[in-house]
Amino acid sequence: MASCFSVSLLARVAVVEPIRVQLWLNVVNCMIESSMHQCPPRDRHFFSSSRPILLIRRSVSTVYRFVASRTTQVLRAAKTVVKWFIIVDPLINSILINYLIDRLCTLGHAVLRVKKRKTEERQPCSPIIQHTHVKRRKRPRLRIVAIKRKRRRRRPHRIERPLSNMYPIMEIQMVAVPLALPSPTALVHYQQQQQQLPQHHPWYDLSLSEEALSTCCCS
C-alpha cells in the first residue's frame, strides 16, 4: 500500500519525540482497525454487514458515525478527525492527517469494490420467452413468461440506539493518553522544518512524497 505521508518527516519528528509518535500511531490504528472490524460483542447487532460503518472518536464523550459508502464521505470523516488533531497535538499534525487519509482512502476504495460487486450480482437474469400460438395469426407471438430475479431477504428495520457507551473503558483511556502539548524544543524544531518546506494545505497532501508535491504546486 502506497503511503501518502512523508517517511523522512516522520523520522525527523520521531527523533525528537519518539514516544509521542508511537502513541499516536497506536491510537490511529486502534481507531481505524479495532473500532470498525473488532467491535465489542454487545454492540455487534448495531452494525450492518451490508453497510461498512466507520466510527471515529473525536473526544472521550462524543462519537461521530460515518457510513463509508463513497470516497467523499470517507474524506469528510478524515477532515473531522483533522480538527481533533489540530486541537490536540500540532507537532505531528500533518503527518498523521496524511496517514489517516491514506488509510481512509484505502477503505473507501475497498467499499466501492464491494458495492460494485453487489450491484452486478443484483442484475436480473435473461427473461424466459416461449412461443404462444394466436388464432388467425401465422407467426406465433412471443410472450415473456417470467423474469428470474434473485430473491433477497428483507430484514426488519432496526432502530439504531444512541451512540453512547459503545467502547470499553480501556479504549477510552487509550484515546485520551496523548492529550499533551509538545515540548518547546520539539515545537521549535518542527517550526523550523516547516518554514523550509513549501506551504500547502495538509488536507490535500495526497502525493507520495514532498518532492512530487512541490513539483505539482510549482507547475
Curated annotation (Swiss-Prot):
Keywords for this protein: Membrane, Transmembrane, Transmembrane helix
Main localization category: membrane
Transmembrane segments: 81-101, 168-188
Recorded GO CC terms: membrane
The organism's place on the tree of life at top rank: Eukaryota
UniProt subcellular location: Membrane
Membrane topology recorded in Swiss-Prot or TrEMBL: Multi-pass membrane protein
Descriptive protein name: Uncharacterized protein YJL118W
Organism from which the protein derives: Saccharomyces cerevisiae (strain ATCC 204508 / S288c) (Baker's yeast)
